[in-house]
């Protein structure tokens, strides 16, 4: 489900994702965002902002130490990125993030079946990836165009 074909700046990705630029810079520093940026980076950044903050029950993580992405976090970000261009992605598509796995489900019936079959009291995060993909064209269109500042050029002596 390709939304646009244009490249986006790091700032535009953050704005379209509804996040501060600091999230985009953190994501860039951890290798989540690499240039050039396209529409899939917007959804990937949103997912990164969620999963980078999760600490599963029973897991200890010092707040002051630099936190590199764990495998499940990277997998969640990449699954979200792939959902943007997946022709099976619908507004009902959801990304389930569990401590040991990531699952994309497309329909409400699949969500119910997944809940019954796989969750059974487990902690999970459900992200509305399909809705975010559906909102991408408007989110990107609403990003204000920034004009480059004019540089002060030396005026010729008169």
Predicted segments, located by residue:
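Polyanion-binding surface elements
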Residues: 1-24
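A short, Lys/Arg-enriched interface patch at domain edges and termini
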Residues: 42-83
